[in-house]
Each structure stands twice: as structure tokens, then as C-alpha cells.
UniProtKB/Swiss-Prot annotation:
Example GO molecular function: D-tyrosyl-tRNA(Tyr) deacylase activity
Free-text note regarding domains: A Gly-cisPro motif from one monomer fits into the active site of the other monomer to allow specific chiral rejection of L-amino acids.
NCBIfam families on file: D-aminoacyl-tRNA deacylase
Quaternary structure, from the entry: Homodimer.
Reactions the enzyme catalyzes: glycyl-tRNA(Ala) + H2O = tRNA(Ala) + glycine + H(+); a D-aminoacyl-tRNA + H2O = a tRNA + a D-alpha-amino acid + H(+)
Native source organism of the sequence: Bacillus mycoides (strain KBAB4)
Protein's UniProt name: D-aminoacyl-tRNA deacylase
UniProt KW keywords: Cytoplasm, Hydrolase, RNA-binding, tRNA-binding
Gene Ontology biological process terms in this record: D-amino acid catabolic process
Keyword tRNA-binding appears in the UniProt entry: yes
Entry-linked SUPFAM superfamilies: DTD-like
PANTHER family: D-AMINOACYL-TRNA DEACYLASE 1, D-TYROSYL-TRNA TYR DEACYLASE
Family membership: Belongs to the DTD family.
Length: 146
């Protein structure tokens, strides 16, 4: 499992001109799932993200988690994170999980994030989405389970 995490001042996701998920402050997650991922990977990443200290304390040191800051999460499925661009000019997506399996694991992952005590908004799995955010910092990290 691969997640691109962005500390966000605000974020939203729109499908067909309608906002389907929106947060005022917290983390925007682009979530990629490969065919080798399991529920164990999803739980590991959910716990890691909820407790990752990437928000500044009063002295400017990254010392607080999204939980500490009472932030929210906007989670967006993104199979293109497993695009392989090493050969040719078109990405190969063979490492991305098949949609049925990926959707199950994506839903499970979001529930695991909720179990950590976070409010989670989502995009629409498999849809073409427009994602808008103000990246705070900017702070952008890649979190992987393997």
C-alpha cells in the first residue's frame, strides 16, 4: 500500500461538479493499493498516518499528529500511484490491484483510519475526480507498507 500524504489547510474532492468530500484542516491522502496488499497493510498505514507527528508545536518543531491537532482526513483512491514509467512512454498499471479487491481494501483502510478517532471524508472510488487543496508547508510524504 502506498499513500501520498499532504498536510492541508483545506481540501475537497468533486465528482461531476458536485463536492463529495471536504475537510477544513488536516490530511489529504492519495491511496494506492497493489495486488499484494492485505488488511494488515491497511491497518499499519492507518495507525502510522493517524500518529505521524507532522504538525508543528508552539516552537515550530514537528511534534503533533493529526489526532493531536483534531484535524480531519480526506482520503482519495488513486491507482495511478502504482504506475510504472520505466519503459516506454505510457505508464503500466499492472502493479495496481484489480478494482474489486482495491475497493474492498480502500473501504477497509478508511474504516481503520476512523477507528483511530479521525473523521474521514472520501472521494468516489473509480470516478474521475477533481481534487483541490491548500498544501500546508508544503508538507508532502509518501507512506508505504512494504
Amino acid at each position: 500500500m502506498r499513500v501520498v500524504l499532504q498536510r492541508s489547510k483545506e481540501a475537497s474532492v468533486t465528482v461531476d461538479g458536485e463536492i463529495v468530500g471536504q475537510i477544513p484542516f488536516g490530511l489529504t491522502l492519495l491511496v494506492g493499493i497493489t495486488h499484494e496488499d492485505t488488511e494488515k497493510d491497511a491497518t499499519y498505514i492507518a495507525e502510522k498516518i493517524a500518529n505521524l507527528r507532522i504538525f508543528e508545536d508552539e516552537s515550530g518543531k514537528m511534534n503533533h499528529s493529526v489526532l493531536d491537532m483534531k484535524g480531519q482526513v480526506l482520503s482519495i483512491s488513486q491507482f495511478t500511484l502504482y504506475g510504472d514509467c520505466r519503459k516506454g512512454r505510457r505508464p503500466n498499471f499492472m502493479d495496481a490491484a484489480k478494482p474489486d479487491y482495491a475497493e474492498h481494501l480502500y473501504d477497509f483502510f478508511n474504516e481503520e483510519v476512523r477507528k483511530q478517532g479521525l473523521h474521514v471524508e472520501t472521494g468516489q472510488f473509480g470516478a474521475m475526480m477533481d481534487v483541490s487543496l491548500i498544501n500546508d508547508g508544503p508538507v508532502t510524504l509518501i507512506v508505504e507498507s512494504k
